[in-house]
From Swiss-Prot:
Organism of provenance: Pseudomonas putida (strain ATCC 47054 / DSM 6125 / CFBP 8728 / NCIMB 11950 / KT2440)
Residues that coordinate or bind substrate: N78, R79, D121, S159, K166, H194
Recorded family membership: Belongs to the LpxH family.
Sequence positions that bind Mn(2+) 2: D40, N78, H113, H194
Function according to Swiss-Prot or TrEMBL: Hydrolyzes the pyrophosphate bond of UDP-2,3-diacylglucosamine to yield 2,3-diacylglucosamine 1-phosphate (lipid X) and UMP by catalyzing the attack of water at the alpha-P atom. Involved in the biosynthesis of lipid A, a phosphorylated glycolipid that anchors the lipopolysaccharide to the outer membrane of the cell.
Membrane topology type: Peripheral membrane protein
Pathway the protein contributes to: Glycolipid biosynthesis; lipid IV(A) biosynthesis; lipid IV(A) from (3R)-3-hydroxytetradecanoyl-[acyl-carrier-protein] and UDP-N-acetyl-alpha-D-glucosamine: step 4/6
Requisite cofactors: Mn(2+)
Domain of life per record: Bacteria
Subcellular location, principal: membrane
Keywords for the protein's UniProt record, in alphabetical order: Cell inner membrane, Cell membrane, Hydrolase, Lipid A biosynthesis, Lipid biosynthesis, Lipid metabolism, Manganese, Membrane, Metal-binding
Reactions listed under catalytic activity: UDP-2-N,3-O-bis[(3R)-3-hydroxytetradecanoyl]-alpha-D-glucosamine + H2O = 2-N,3-O-bis[(3R)-3-hydroxytetradecanoyl]-alpha-D-glucosaminyl 1-phosphate + UMP + 2 H(+)
Any one of the GO CC terms: extrinsic component of plasma membrane
The protein, known as: UDP-2,3-diacylglucosamine hydrolase
Length: 240
């Protein structure tokens, strides 16, 4: 069994989500061969050198799962792209490139966070290119902690404002981009998060039937994609 989740947006202000994640680690994930976390794991991450006690507790729980034999793979999201190798080493997880192609359920599957598919959101794409270039990443990681906290608060506030102002079409994936990206990677299944619109979409890629599986965000309930001998099963679950 393989589990895939995304968009937990872990933060101290939402202990219900944190408890649900810890329950997953102590429960279903213990029986999984691997757990994939496809971005926006944390609501914000300003650097491995600034871990709070809350974030350290999550890291330690992940390490316990890793030590028990479940492999953990973590992909950057737009909220936590400063997660680095120091955190991953402590948590016992592997940092996964976005995009990545893995073998899943007997086929090659493309994994993405999903934000790069939203090409109609020109303002976001411009900001993403600015923040993700190597020079910007170096500068961000070497800013004083106070400056990083201030910048993170500013970006989160602006992001919430922009999402409210933009149409749903702009902040969703660009329909034409999806088959193009899938064809470029030679896959018929894509799994991503980011949009908070869980669903399984059918489409055609190079004249062949294909599917796009969108993971759900964790808010009022959690979401997980389970891949086993029964196939690909996307389903929500209630927080205990």
């Amino acid at each position: 069994m393989i589990l895939l989740i995304s968009d937990l947006h872990l933060q101290e202000e939402r202990p219900d989500i944190s408890r649900a994640f810890l329950d997953l680690l102590d429960g279903r994930a213990r029986h999984a061969k691997a757990l994939y976390i496809l971005g926006d794991f944390f609501e914000a991450w300003i650097g491995d050198d600034a871990m709070t006690p809350f974030q350290q507790s999550i890291c330690q729980a992940m390490r316990r799962l890793s030590d028990s034999g479940t492999a953990i793979y973590l992909m950057h999201g737009n909220r936590d792209f400063l997660i680095g190798q120091a955190f991953c080493k402590a948590a016992g997880c592997t940092l996964l490139n976005d995009p990545s192609v893995i073998e899943l359920g007997g086929e090659q599957v493309l994994l993405m966070h999903g934000d790069t598919l939203c090409t109609r959101d020109l303002g976001y794409m411009k900001m993403r290119r600015l923040l993700r270039n190597p020079l910007s990443l170096w500068i961000l990681r070497h800013l004083p902690l106070s400056a990083r906290y201030k910048l993170a608060r500013k970006l989160r506030s602006e992001s919430r404002t922009q999402v409210r102002m933009k149409s749903t079409e702009i902040v969703d994936v660009t329909p034409e981009e999806v088959p193009k990206v899938m064809a470029a990677h030679g896959v018929r299944t894509l799994v991503h998060g980011h949009t908070h619109r869980p669903a399984i979409h059918k489409l055609m890629v190079d004249g062949q039937p294909a599917r796009r599986i969108v993971l759900g965000d964790w808010d009022r309930r959690g979401w997980a994609l389970q891949v086993d001998e029964q196939g690909f099963q996307l389903a929500p679950f209630e927080f205990s």
